[in-house]
Amino acid sequence: NNYGIEVDIKKDLSFIGLPNFSWSFNGALIKSRVNFSGTTLMENRPMQGQSPYLVNTGIFYKNEKLQLDAALLYNRIGKRIIGVGRSEGTTSGNEALRVPDSYEMPRDVLDLSVSKKFGTHWEVKANIRDILAQRVYYKEFVTATLNDGTTKKVEQITRSFKPGRNIGLSITYKL
């Protein structure tokens, strides 16, 4: 099952004294459920790869006279399953066979792009992708049994990497 709500807004900002600017927003709340029995740790879990929310927003600048365009874009997605766990064999009490679901954790992504035309033939474009360059974290959430028999919820990082910024520059000549 998959259901949700999405909002999409686009607004020219000239009403606040910014005649060449516009703003856009897209956001969604999604509820997804897949039902399994016996093969995963969670019999009723979110769909793999489906975020419970996403936010995209941006400020855009467009000046026809100067032939200049710019955009500052923000994106965030919610925690999502990237690897489905398994629980086969856990009925015998062998906890070593339990593999929890693996989640990609939310992070903020900010992009900037600028393009400028020179006459009718030349265009220069520059962009920076992932300005914030936040780390990507994959985590598992497990319940550990301590020596005294009590249980404790544990969050463990299974993978972490920093994708880094991407910077681009292009010069185009159109015939």
Spans of model-derived segments:
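C-terminal beta-signal and adjacent terminal beta-strands/loops
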Residues: 76-90, 116-175
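Gram-negative outer-membrane beta-barrel transporters
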Residues: 1-84
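Transmembrane beta-barrel architecture of outer membranes
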Residues: 52-56, 109, 166
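Charged, glycine/proline-rich intrinsically disordered loops and linkers
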Residues: 91-95
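Extracellular loop and loop/strand-boundary signature of outer-membrane beta-barrel proteins
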Residues: 39-46, 96-101, 111, 154-159
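Hydrophobic, well-ordered secondary-structure elements that form the walls
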Residues: 7, 25, 59, 72, ...
